[in-house]
Amino acid sequence: MGSFSIWHWLIVLLIIMMVFGTKKLRNIGSDLGSAVKGFKEGMREGSEDKPAGSQQGQQAAGQPPRELHDSTTIDVEARDKSKQG
């Protein structure tokens, strides 16, 4: 009782076509298709970039990690010790 038959879907489609018109539906379909295509191309480009990054990661794995210090960073423990002592 909760599922719709094919006739229900056809009637809904007919009402949608009457409300929006076939031209607007065609535009929506082409916009959706181009969005999916763009998404797939972006995913493909992302997977092509990934192997290049993994090679850099392998080269950096042999080197010890460097500590980055920022002049605006405050070491909280050192500040607390200086206040106490």
Swiss-Prot record:
It is a single-pass membrane protein. The chain crosses the membrane at residues 1-21. Its main location: membrane. The keyword Signal does not apply. It comes from the Bacteria. The keyword DNA-binding does not apply. InterPro entries: TatA/B/E, TatA/E. Gene3D superfamilies: 1.20.5.3310. The Tat system comprises two distinct complexes: a TatABC complex, containing multiple copies of TatA, TatB and TatC subunits, and a separate TatA complex, containing only TatA subunits. Substrates initially bind to the TatABC complex, which probably triggers association of the separate TatA complex to form the active translocon. HAMAP family: TatA_E. This is Sec-independent protein translocase protein TatA. It comes from Ralstonia nicotianae (strain ATCC BAA-1114 / GMI1000).
